Amino acid sequence: LVLNSYLLGLLLLGDRARSALVRLPAAIGLVLAMDLVLDPAAVSLGFWAYDAGGVYYGVPWSNYAGWVLSATVSVILFDVAFQGTALLERLRTCEFMLDDLVSFVILWGAINAAFANWLPLAVALALGGGLLATDRFDFDVAETVPGLAWLRPREGGERP
């Protein structure tokens, strides 16, 4: 979760990712967003349960506080280990860095939809929108998925 969040944040932020004050909070927020998708679906499937329950689809807020803490430590370590902006340049040349994140969004988003967990589904759709915005697929999504023609680049390569 953490590495994918970090990488997605780098791509979505573009040149703004050069600032650690922008990059790090964005990555931490994306980790939290992914857990807001994962945990409700996992609880619905019975993969895990919390004795005290929780107001967010059976998940206590303390779980998310723990994710914020662990994400903060992990993201800072990634930033140091990957030399922050040096990774951004490498990421721009590799089209397939986020393939497993696509699977994550589809799988856990679909499970949330099946259990009528609408808020986690909305977060999954937002993450999916972020993935679409990065345009990191080995096929033209706009040509493959009906209704997404608006994603096609304009003349000159710009997206709408």
Identify the residue ranges that each predicted region occupies.
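Aromatic-rich, lipid-facing transmembrane alpha helices and their immediate juxtamembrane interface loops
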Residues: 1-160
